Amino acid sequence: MPLEMEPKMSKLVFGCQRSSTSDDDSGCALEEYAWVPPGLRPEQIQLYFACLPEEKVPYVNSPGEKHRIKQLLYQLPPHDNEVRYCQSLSEEEKKELQVFSAQRKKEALGRGTIKLLSRAVMHAVCEQCGLQMNGGEVAVFASRAGPGVCWHPSCFVCFTCNELLVDLIYFYQDGKIHCGRHHAELLKPRCSACDEIIFADECTEAEGRHWHMKHFCCLECETVLGGQRYIMKDGRPFCCGCFESLYAEYCETCGEHIGVDHAQMTYDGQHWHATEACFSCAQCKASLLGCPFLPKQGQIYCSKTCSLGEDIHASDSSDSAFQSARSRDSRRSVRMGRSSRSADQCRQSLLLSPALNYKFPGLSGNADDTLSRKLDDVSLASRQGAGFANEEFWKARVEQEASEDPEEWAEHEDYMTQLLLKFGDKNLFQQQSSEVDPRASEHWIPDNMVTNKPEVKPNHQGLASKKYQSDMYWAQSQDGLGDSAYGSHPGPASSRRLQELDLDHGAAGYTHDQSQWYEDSLECLSDLKPEQSIRDSMDSLALSNITGASVDGESKPRPSLYSLQNFEEIEAEDCEKMSNMGTLNSSMLHRSAESLQSLNSGLCPEKILPEEKPAHLPVLRRSKSQSRPQQVKFSDDVIDNGSYDIEIRQPPMSERTRRRAYHFEERGSRPHHHRHRRSRKSRSDNALNLVTERKYSAKDRLRLYTPDNYEKFIQNKSARELQAYMQNANLYSQYAHATSDYALQNPGMNRFLGLCGEDDDSWCSSSTSSSDSEEEGYFLGQPIPQPRPQRFTYYTDDLSSPASALPTPQFTQRTTKSKKKKGHKGKNCIIS
């Protein structure tokens, strides 16, 4: 149709030029336009083109001319009217096309007419924009729309595509004007592949468009995709095979294509199969599905430890401390407001035992030693035979415990590095072979040589244990969680079996013949109830440091390595080495259970063990910046009703505070270990119960102070001692109802008071970790400033700096009436 119009337009232009009464400079030189509306005078043509956008005016060799040609091909497709322009039509389809084209021309085709509105026209309105048109303006009329319908020249556009109708050619349908393309699509579907009208009876409809059946095929291999699976890429269909070969991503782990049917993980332009094997830590191969990860140099890791390329299974306790940078100092000031003890402080006692693997205490640096110890443990298992009926029950409880606070387990490695950077070059972590105890390689003393063996009820539990009964089985250790300071998820690291944990076999010279491995593992926490000792309580504290779980009586009784004769010498030699940061656990110093038992053996006329050389333990000296003041907190969530069966009503679990609790024990048995929320239980209550259950002769028993003889006891004291006692009593007067729970229950505690009463200055000096010897108070060649000893220093629980336990004598135990006020039934003084 446009081809037929070109001669007419040429004739029109030639006629205008021939009939023009003006020369070329009159402004009516029509040869400058590639097309002009037919039937207009030159001045009318100028008025019409003046109403159009400049870029759409078809000047010769202008962008407007190119736009016109483009619109002619788009709005008036030649294959919609002529069979010769169609690619593959059957004879029947060719006939349909001819009929279709003729019908459209007859019923809808038209050309717009340019007219000047008469001055008499007062109410003409543009059909497109709805604005009023005044007389004398140029308007476009469409004969098929009616005589009174008109448009602005710039508003004469297709109803569907809103483009100017090229050369004023329109198709009228249902009161709207359309271009030729969109008018044909109102009647027949158009193939998206060949752009031709579909005259066949069947077609494929996909993605909101239509295709010939044979044209809906893969763009690459031309496989017909009708009824098949396909993938659209840039508006074109592909079969699954071609798409995978052309556009599918490669897995970063296995290097294979990630199929269209396979889920994939994508991060920063990298892709992985969404499987545990592919989307896993590049170092330890732990699955990272659903877990945070640490990207580094194109690889992903579960923790910062793995990102450094270190094998945690092959490292010892010293190596594992090098796994992070010095970021602890920058974060330490931010954490000052926290009152709970952080996980890294609990780990410091483990750091001081090089024989232990930091992450996995069951794995020492010597693989042969580990293997031989395992074999021995297995041989012991055949002789024990009892208490393993609930093995499946223990394993079923593994997944029930919630993970630890991510803020705590994610930070410990930076602090470990800080310790090594400060003290590692001073050989403080090296065990010297010349000081190895010859008895360290021997087994423990047989049970028949143990003196003061306690009598323990086999199925007895204190209130504290009963309270946390549901939480006593498993707790994911902070040491076993992910190490990344960037938010590594604990999931991957928790897959490293906690069953690899043995009890700390290097704490006090005990080596390879410990109780069988299964018995010491976390799968047997309260299955077995053998006889307990003070040493068991201390070991459970160390194990709690490692695993975050409490062990109720799983170790066999272990005798003390120290006697009363060398106790003072050891104390004078090693007390100076203690750190106020809590780097030495009470179970690892001579002021722990060892001191307690040796002190008891001195008080009782019984057999004293031969004097032995103390086991060598490397320690950390305290620098001035590391010492922090002590703190005291009060908590009402732990009451030790261990052996007395006194009815004390407990508040509901939702109303109890989650504080770490300490029971004051005898002198030298002051654990620096705090309970870590619900999953970590201090074993100080065990030691307390054991003290009360020891049997003494009448002459060796210390006097219990009743309200009557207590007054006589006070009168016999010096003025200086009396002042200290009264000052202490005043401080604890408001908690008299809390301490009264132990007034007549705990003879061991009163025995402790009697010891303190004999020398009130001794407990003040021994309760701190400052040096007892002026001559040894040097660090890095500089003398350590000696702080003034303070008997009672109390701070709010704003600071989280660890402090040594302050066993203040509780002389308010005269009060025997226990108050039943809710939430204040029996408070214990705990040290933070």
UniProtKB/Swiss-Prot annotation:
Ranges where the record places region Disordered: 314-342, 663-688, 765-832
Localization terms from the record: Nucleus membrane; Cytoplasm, Cytosol
Keyword line: Cytoplasm, LIM domain, Lipoprotein, Membrane, Metal-binding, Methylation, Nucleus, Phosphoprotein, Prenylation, Repeat, Zinc
One Gene Ontology MF term: zinc ion binding
Sections of the chain in a coiled coil: none
List of residues that carry Phosphoserine: S315, S592, S595, S684
Lipid attachment residues per UniProt (S-farnesyl cysteine): C829
GO cellular component, one term: cell trailing edge
Polar residues: bias regions: 798-815
Annotated ranges, domain LIM zinc-binding: 124-188, 189-249, 250-313
Cleaved propeptide residues: 830-832
Entries under InterPro entries matching the protein: LIM2_prickle, LIM3_prickle, PET_domain, PET_prickle, Pk/Esn/Tes, Znf_LIM
Residue span(s) of domain PET: 14-122
Assembly notes: Interacts with REST.
Official protein name in the record: Prickle-like protein 1
